[in-house]
Amino acid sequence: MIDGAMQDFQLTLDRFLDHAAKWHPDAEVVSARDDGTVGRINYAELHRRARLVSAALDTLNIKTGDRVATLAWNTQEHVEAWYGIMGMGAVCHTLNPRLTAEQLGWMIGQSEASILLASSDLLDLAREVIGSSTNGVCRLIALGPVKDDNDSLDDLLGQPSQEIAWGGFDETLPSGLCFTSGTTGAPKGVTYTHRGNYLHTLKLLQADVTSITAREVVMPVVPMFHANAWGLPFACPAVGAKLVLPGRYADGASLARFIANESVTIAVGVPTVWLGLMDHLDANGIELPSLKRIMVGGAPMSQALMDRIEQRGIEVQTTWGMTELSPLGTATPPGAEARDPRTSGRPAVGVDLRLTDDEGNPLDVQREVEGHLWVRGAAVVDRYFGQEQLATADGWFNTGDLARIERDGTVLITGRSKDLIKSGGEWINPTEIETVISALPCVSQSAVIGRSDPKWGERPLLLVELRDGYSPTDAELLAELDGRVASWWIPDQVVRLPQMPLAPTGKIDKLRLRNEYCNA
């Protein structure tokens, strides 16, 4: 036996805030408030307050592994609660305020959360959530000041009898719970672990992934209730980057003002967010000189939108991932030449990919072919909350995406297997049609779904949201597909929508579109 060993240093998430408080104590966390003011604290103060949250939860009899739900936007108070819950070994179950009370009530019934921490502006919704849930033991506590007699977390912080309950537990314990968006079916719970989130954070910080350093000012527009804001509230304190939290407002005007005022250098979110920002900048002749890079994921970005952003000297960094991956799987490296916006870069270290056939068998050739994308890694889901084994025995998880891996290892997401349209026994890939149509200057957003057809089984239906000032005919829109896709792929009909329906994630809500138009 070789003498000597490395220390047993548990990879738990409280260590990121410990590190920030010790080595980057003055780096700022800035938060937009509903009243138009801006809250500012530093990592030293965030660390102090998060530890007090842990102590308060301990006095409320929250134990290791207990679920505590949050109903809040990206704010300072939410980050404090988030770290306070995870820092004492409890599980932070983040809820999406854009869902209905019934949907959220079902979720806290599933998780059996014993406390719901809600932003002051969301207390009415929170009461409805608890009232509609089968969870009869969930206690409501407000984040921030309240005007009624509702319990407030602020009143529970720093009581003399409290002892700090912080860290000192096993890295394999669960840290968080996020439910998938449910845009194509019932939401499923994904349980994160401290070890998985810690390793995911190290993956994010690689030079060829986010390349975030203490010199950056980072604004995650993606909410904390979507896969932990893609892990950025862990990554920023880990390196001492200034963290800018936009609160509830993600409209173009609000984001432009916040980016300018706080000199944001990196902003992160789904394509619809950046569409709104570009429209606002164009309409008002505004420039954002501090903004160097936009990271995009969650849904495909059109070539037209990518071009609009890059014409302003802002780099677009495309990524691919999903809730089940914590969420990042691949990323184009910062500074890479602009390519097809569907290109999502290479997998980061700790992520393994493979392509399979329809039956799940690995393809003999893994380059320059299309297949079903499977993934495994330290931050990849093994099974959904309350369900049996999901991944294969050797750890492979079926993402549901179709992909092509190029010769150089970059990944091109070509569609979703559940979105494929079967017409006359042959498959049509809606993503290829959407890519062509969304690149047109007249189109703001587009979606293609399968519609029932008595002869062919299904036929593609094109739905578009046009940009203001444009009125192309159906024939003009469909003519753009000639020679770009097979002739029998061209949709038979075009439906114009005043506004494309979006899921709470900011993605196009194809489930709603199918429900409304599939049999029309």
Task: Annotate each PLM feature.
Residues 57-62, 161-172, 177-219, 231, ...:
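Conserved adenylate-forming
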Residues 238, 264-268, 279-339, 352, ...:
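Gly/Ser/Thr-rich phosphate-binding loop
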Residues 18, 59-60, 87-155, 165, ...:
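Structural core segment of the AMP-binding/adenylate-forming
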Residues 29-75, 79-83, 100-105, 154:
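Conserved AMP-binding/adenylate-forming core of the ANL superfamily
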Residues 352-374, 407-408, 470-474, 509:
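Conserved beta-loop-beta connector loops within the AMP-binding
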Residues 330, 346-350, 361-394, 426-428:
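Conserved ATP/PPi-binding loop(s) of AMP-dependent carboxylate-activating enzymes
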Residues 198-217, 227-265, 280:
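Conserved AMP-binding/adenylation subdomain of ANL enzymes
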Residues 99, 116-118, 257, 377, ...:
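AMP-binding/adenylate-forming catalytic core of the ANL superfamily
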